[in-house]
């Protein structure tokens, strides 16, 4: 049976799959569109399983305020092109709505949206992953998104404009803790050990190296804490000094960046093209 363009168009509209996939599905079912849809749903699950091994390190960070808390969500895909796709963003926003409705765990979000995720993988041809969700308590908050890749929420006693500026600072400067004294003892001890070793390797006697490290450790805890960092909008002041002038405090913050901690697989362009050609010849 000859498959008409109109039938292919209808199947594309109903499934969102590619033209060649639709044509192939209709040929396999002799033009039975309902059976083709069933088969594509089944093969879509298989396709999603194949894509699951692909590294998803692109994506988006979304933020939404709930009742007394704010949710930050990361959803990943494989390419920055898909990260801007309307279907991908619609899926991510659906997950966000549920997360912000009641502090739903990432495990429960994954389970609830698995069927929709599988369908989306089949539709766009990339692995999709609901990677993480974090929540920060407080009503007095400011949120900042730098493009789609970085999301920050800061809570404290400051006014909205001040908190927004602090959120922008966190996005740019990547502090790990609020105050220098919040840096865990084990982190300080590990850094001290490294700095002593560096000083000894520079030729300093151990007892002198130990004394030198005290200054370096103060610098280290300042660099990794929000209040110890130079404020990006007034670099001559630390964030702590800026807050003191404002009579304000920061209670907590969360910063998420797309793909942080995910090891990307690097392939050169020629190798990627060769891989695609080989795959098409096997099909």
Swiss-Prot record:
GO cellular component, one term: cytoplasm
Chain segments carrying region Involved in Mg(2+) ion dislocation from EF-Tu: 79-82
GO function terms (MF aspect): translation elongation factor activity
Keywords: Cytoplasm, Elongation factor, Protein biosynthesis
Pfam families noted in UniProt: EF_TS
SUPFAM superfamilies reported for this sequence: Elongation factor Ts (EF-Ts), dimerisation domain (SSF54713), UBA-like (SSF46934)
InterPro entries with a match to the protein in the record: EF-Ts_dimer_sf, Transl_elong_EFTs/EF1B, Transl_elong_EFTs/EF1B_dimer, Transl_elong_Ts_CS, UBA-like_sf
PANTHER family in UniProt: ELONGATION FACTOR TS, ELONGATION FACTOR TS, MITOCHONDRIAL
Function (record text): Associates with the EF-Tu.GDP complex and induces the exchange of GDP to GTP. It remains bound to the aminoacyl-tRNA.EF-Tu.GTP complex up to the GTP hydrolysis stage on the ribosome.
Record protein name field: Elongation factor Ts
Top-level taxonomy: Bacteria, Pseudomonadati, Pseudomonadota, Gammaproteobacteria, Alteromonadales
Gene name tied to this protein: tsf
């Amino acid at each position: 049976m000859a498959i008409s363009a109109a039938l292919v168009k209808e199947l594309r509209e109903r499934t969102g799959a590619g033209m060649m996939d639709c044509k192939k599905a209709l040929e396999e079912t002799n033009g039975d569109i309902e059976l083709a849809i069933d088969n594509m749903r089944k093969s879509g699950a298989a396709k999603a399983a194949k894509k699951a091994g692909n590294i998803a390190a692109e994506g988006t960070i979304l933020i939404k305020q709930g009742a007394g808390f704010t949710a930050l969500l990361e959803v990943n895909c494989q390419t920055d092109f898909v990260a801007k796709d309307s279907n991908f963003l619609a899926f991510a926003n659906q997950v966000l709505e549920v997360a912000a409705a009641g502090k739903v765990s990432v495990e429960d979000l994954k389970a609830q949206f698995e069927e929709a995720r599988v369908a989306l993988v089949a539709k766009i041809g990339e692995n999709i992953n609901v990677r993480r969700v974090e929540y920060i308590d407080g009503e007095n908050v400011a949120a900042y998104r730098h493009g789609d890749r970085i999301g920050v929420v800061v809570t404290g006693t400051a006014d909205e404009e001040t908190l927004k500026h602090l959120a922008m600072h966190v996005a740019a400067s990547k502090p790990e803790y609020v105050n220098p004294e919040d840096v865990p003892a084990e982190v300080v001890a590990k850094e001290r050990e490294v700095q002593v070793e560096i000083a000894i390797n520079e030729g300093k006697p151990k007892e002198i190296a130990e004394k030198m490290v005290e200054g370096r450790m103060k610098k280290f805890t300042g660099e990794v804490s929000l209040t110890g960092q130079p404020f990006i909008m007034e670099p001559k002041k630390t964030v702590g000094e800026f807050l003191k002038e404002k009579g304000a405090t920061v209670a907590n913050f969360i910063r998420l960046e797309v793909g942080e901690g995910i090891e990307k697989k690097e392939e050169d362009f020629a190798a990627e093209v060769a891989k695609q050609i080989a795959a098409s010849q096997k099909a």
